[in-house]
Amino acid sequence: MQIVYLFSSVLLTAALAHENGKVAYPFRLFNGTSSVEEISQQDQMDAPKIMPHVNATTFEWWYFDAVSTTSQNESLTVMFENMGPEGLGAPYPGGPLAVQISGSFSNGTAFTIITAATKGAVLEWGGGGVRGEWRGAGSSFAGKDHREYTVSIANPGIGVYGTMTLRSVSPPRYPCDVKERRASEQLIPNMYLANSQPDAIVEVDFNINESTLKFSGIGYHDLSWGSAPLESSVHSWYWGHGRLGRYSLVWFDVMGRDGKEYFSAWITEAGNVILCGCEPDSVLVRPWGENSGFPPGRGTPAPSGYSLRYDLGQNQIFIANFTREVNIIDNDFTKHIIGLFSGGFEGGEQYEGRAMADQFQFGDL
């Protein structure tokens, strides 16, 4: 299906030209051409990026996660999805709007719950703030100035109630730039990113089918979207975030279907940016231990962990190591995992912390 991009779409430019906006999405696909934003707009980091609505091959999701630093195994991820059936390759609930809730309890037991927003979704944005409500799913999120977000769920049909609150400790960014007007939002061809919270202090207080999930830890929030099915753009993908002492880290290392390797590196020290870029090998991620073939193909089990090498230039190298502990989502195409995190500058003080990581693997072995 043909996609018309931002610069050739007068309608999309007009729709997103104002700082304040509101859109209501129905629980059905758009049967036509969808327009996709590629260049950032002022104070619209969390605004919808696909207009007038997703069709069968496009997608966007508002993603929030939390990893406990007060217990070993606890985590929570909430994704507000707006997707065509071919967009993400995820379970399709009969319409484009769904909320996926996944996580793990202190005993290491993982769960995934998907609920459809059959009554549609409403998004409002302006002045750096945003509010989204997925109606029929009992789920919403709200944020202000990219500094604090709250995710709320009250859905008796799936037995999930609670709130997640995230307070930023690392400034917002795009794949290759800090937050600014008219920055490129492209992560890889046909895939885009706006990362409002690369790192956050998070508080989680949830009840999942009468089991308590309550902890403090590190959090993360972004908005991702695509102009073509994810599987058609990505062969394999390593992503993650973590905190080591005063350092906040995010990594993307993606092998595209075009055979090229794409990178997006981010490190802040006490909230100050010391690395932001997409240069080759700015962050090199490789699996280690069991199942450490590169690149991974569909059906490959999760590796023991990942080694990360950030190149800040001028002979400054930051080395980090992720050790897998809990598989939250584990299927032929997706690994969503939490684990131990350690590292620091070569020759400098070393730190320990926690991290969340994803591995996508759509290519054949």
Swiss-Prot record:
Alphabetical keyword list: Copper, Lyase, Metal-binding
Catalytic activities: (1'E,3'E)-5-(3,3-dimethyloxiran-2-yl)-3-methylhexa-1,3-dienyl-quinolinone B = aspoquinolone A; (1'E,3'E)-5-(3,3-dimethyloxiran-2-yl)-3-methylhexa-1,3-dienyl-quinolinone B = aspoquinolone B
E.C. no: 4.2.-.-
Gene Ontology molecular-function annotations: lyase activity; metal ion binding
Pathway, per record: Secondary metabolite biosynthesis; Alkaloid biosynthesis; Mycotoxin biosynthesis
CDD domains found in the cross-reference section: asqI-like
Any Pfam family: DA_N
Family recorded in the similarity comment: Belongs to the quinolone epoxide rearrangement protein penF family.
Known role: Quinolone epoxide rearrangement protein; part of the gene cluster that mediates the biosynthesis of the aspoquinolone mycotoxins. Within the pathway, asqO catalyzes an enzymatic 3-exo-tet cyclization to yield the cyclopropyl-THF ring system in aspoquinolone. The first step of the pathway is catalyzed by the nonribosomal peptide synthetase asqK that condenses anthranilic acid and O-methyl-L-tyrosine to produce 4'-methoxycyclopeptin. 4'-methoxycyclopeptin is then converted to 4'-methoxydehydrocyclopeptin by the ketoglutarate-dependent dioxygenase asqJ.
This protein's name: Quinolone epoxide rearrangement protein asqO
Gene designation per UniProt: asqO
